[in-house]
Amino acid sequence: MNARERDLQKGLRLLHLLHQTNPYPQGPGTASQRRNRRRRWKQRGLQILALADRIHPLPDSPTEGPLDLAIQRLQNLIIKDLPNPPTSTPTAQASTCIPPIWDQLVPRSNPSSSQGCGRDSCERGEDLVGSPQESGRRDHCNTQEDQTRG
């Protein structure tokens, strides 16, 4: 490690220590006490940022060298001619090639007439668990009739 890298590491350790010495304010108190603690915490944080900028100033603009190199590389790019598209039409085998995951899928069958119209049908002879409904039970879909009776 050369001297520049050691100085940089030392500065970064100092910045890390400075940030650790200013934790976010915690604790009970009235709203104005909490507000004042947050205000002082923010002021200390701004002072730490000012010190950090003095310890390790960031460059104002990126160096010119890498940008010029990138521009030169972009200028050297060449668009090549694309090959001619294929003239033959696809064969029947290519159109029937189905990925293996789709090959195993089986379409759902339509529900039988004894099961009603679908999942939410009230005319079904079975409830959601699959056991037959009791004959004494009222149809739970006719809630308006139940409300007018009661």
Curated annotation (Swiss-Prot):
Keywords, comma-separated and alphabetical: AIDS, Host cytoplasm, Host nucleus, mRNA transport, RNA-binding, Transport
Q: Which GO terms describe its cellular component?
A: host cell cytoplasm; host cell nucleolus
One of the entry's Gene Ontology molecular-function terms is:
RNA binding
> In what ranges is there compositional bias, type Polar residues?
20-33, 107-116
Q: Where is this motif: Nuclear export signal and binding to XPO1?
A: 69-80
| Motif Nuclear localization signal and RNA-binding (RRE), residue numbers | 33-47
Function, as annotated, reads: Escorts unspliced or incompletely spliced viral pre-mRNAs (late transcripts) out of the nucleus of infected cells. These pre-mRNAs carry a recognition sequence called Rev responsive element (RRE) located in the env gene, that is not present in fully spliced viral mRNAs (early transcripts). This function is essential since most viral proteins are translated from unspliced or partially spliced pre-mRNAs which cannot exit the nucleus by the pathway used by fully processed cellular mRNAs.
The name of this protein is Protein Rev
Tell me the organism: Human immunodeficiency virus type 2 subtype B (isolate EHO) (HIV-2)
Give the gene that encodes this protein.
Answer: rev
